[in-house]
Structures are given as structure tokens and as C-alpha cells.
């Protein structure tokens, strides 16, 4: 089965509309982006009522901000890992720590503006666990897989054809990164690496980040190989 992928920019990041025998949406963008989402659906030739599931890769504000609006537009249920359900249902806006010096500076500055950001609360209909969730019932040949690291409840969508929609497990957009690679923010850098090892072992070939354009999984494979030669790297050390 061929799956058509349509990105829709919702602020600084994007959501993805996947069309197979059914339609799902991945991520909910920044707040107040419902109109942009509706326009994107129209460009993709998708009727709102055709969307059967909204998968949120994690609970940070720029991925859940318009989740409630998208749910209202489509009538589709929201899926989010159980560890982060409260973030959406209680309008919480935690930020992950920076991994690199630049990441730490970026997140510090970002934090100054967080009091201005309001995430509308929305009910999560499908709390996800750590086990895979097949998407065949929604007409998509693939699965939701647990890929913690950027946050403790991060998930990815991995299609049988190798396309991986990873949220912020990778980044490919200025000013976050100049080129595709590992995220500059993460709750657990070693967990990020383990999640990448799992995705690559399971056949990921093309990576679709929430920030930036898709790129080859070989980029991540080389990044992990390089880190394996630097055992003192922060990416391999748990925070204390």
C-alpha cells in the first residue's frame, strides 16, 4: 500500500497527514493553528471527517498546542503517551533540558517567553503505553513505537516502508540545527540513542522530523557510529 505524506506547517514545526486506505495526522503544532491545519487538509484533498486518528509524538507545547482544535475539526481521537497525558489535559508547558551548550542557552531564552504561551486543554482519548500500536485498523501500514529520550513519553510512527515520523527525536531546522541530526534538547540523551538504535534496527530509512525537512536515516546511523567512538560523550551518560 502506498502512503501519501503531506506536511502542514503549524508554527515553527509541522504536522504530517498520512493517507493510505485511511488517514491519520501526526502532531498538533503550536497553539491557534487550527485554520492553518484546515487549509492544509484542503490542499491535500482530505476531508476533515476522513481523519481517523491524531498521534501526538510528545507533549511539549509546540506539538500539542492546536491538538484540541484539530480534534474539533476532524472528530478524530487524540493519542498521546500516558506519561504526558496530563500535559495536554492540564495545559502544562514543561521544557526539556538542553544537551549541548547551545541547546542550554536556547532553552534558557525560550523559557523567558513561556509565560506568554497558553496551550488549550484537550481530552486524550487514547493514552499510549510502551508497547507498539498497529495502525492497520486506521488504514495505515505501520505502527506507533515508543521512542523515549527527548521526553519520557515520546513516540514515533514507523511505516512498514521505512518512513519514520519522529517528532523531536531528530531536528533539521535553523536555528535549532544547521544540518539534520540529534536534538539539542533531551530529558535523557542516552535514551535518545537507544531509541535511534531501535528505529534503525527496525528498518527506518527516511526520517521526518517535526522541525525541518525529511532526510536519510543514514545521517542518524553515522551520528550514532561517531558517538560510539566517544564513550565520554554526554549522549552516552545519564544525568545525575
Labelled PLM ranges:
Residues 1-44, 156-172:
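Conserved beta-strand hairpin/beta-sheet module of binuclear metal-dependent hydrolase folds
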Residues 8, 18, 132-138:
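Short acidic-hydrophobic surface loop/beta-edge motif
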Residues 24-26, 55, 78, 163-165, ...:
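Residue-level marker for buried hydrophobic side chains located in beta-strands
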Residues 30-31, 83-86, 170-171, 232:
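Short, acidic/turn-prone active-site loops that include or flank metal/cofactor-
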Residues 31-32, 118-125, 132, 141-218:
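Metallo-beta-lactamase
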Residues 37-40, 66, 195, 223:
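A general structural detector for well-ordered alpha-helical segments in enzyme core domains, enriched
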Residues 42-127, 233:
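Active-site HxH/HxHxD metal-binding segment of metal-dependent hydrolases
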Residues 215-240:
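Binuclear metal-ion centers of metallo-dependent hydrolases, dominated by the metallo-beta-lactamase
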Amino acid at each position: 500500500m502506498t502512503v501519501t505524506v503531506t506536511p502542514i506547517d503549524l508554527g515553527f514545526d509541522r504536522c504530517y497527514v498520512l493517507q493510505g486506505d485511511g488517514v491519520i495526522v501526526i502532531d498538533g503544532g503550536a497553539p491557534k493553528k487550527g485554520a492553518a491545519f484546515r487549509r492544509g487538509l484542503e490542499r491535500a484533498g482530505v476531508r476533515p471527517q476522513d481523519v481517523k486518528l491524531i498521534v501526538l509524538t510528545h507533549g511539549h507545547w509546540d506539538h500539542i498546542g492546536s491538538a484540541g482544535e484539530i480534534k474539533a475539526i476532524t472528530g478524530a481521537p487524540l493519542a498521546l503517551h500516558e506519561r504526558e497525558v496530563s500535559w495536554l489535559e492540564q495545559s502544562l508547558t514543561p521544557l526539556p533540558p538542553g544537551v549541548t551548550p547551545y541547546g542550554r542557552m536556547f532553552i534558557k531564552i525560550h523559557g523567558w517567553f513561556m509565560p506568554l504561551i497558553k496551550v488549550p486543554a484537550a481530552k486524550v482519548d487514547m493514552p499510549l503505553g510502551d508497547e507498539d500500536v498497529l495502525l492497520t485498523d486506521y488504514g495505515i501500514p505501520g505502527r506507533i513505537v515508543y521512542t523515549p529520550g527527548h521526553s519520557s513519553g515520546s513516540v514515533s510512527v514507523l511505516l512498514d516502508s521505512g518512513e519514520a515520523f519522529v517528532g523531536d527525536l531528530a531536528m533539521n531546522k535553523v536555528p535549532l540545527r544547521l544540518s539534520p541530526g540529534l536534538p539539542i534538547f533531551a530529558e535523557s540523551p542516552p535514551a535518545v540513542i537507544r531509541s535511534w538504535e531501535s528505529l534503525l534496527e527496525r528498518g527506518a530509512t527516511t526520517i521526518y522530523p517535526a522541525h525541518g525537512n525529511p532526510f536519510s536515516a543514514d545521517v542518524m546511523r553515522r551520528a550514532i557510529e561517531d558517538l560510539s567512538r566517544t564513550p565520554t560523550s554526554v549522549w552516552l551518560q545519564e544525568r545525575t
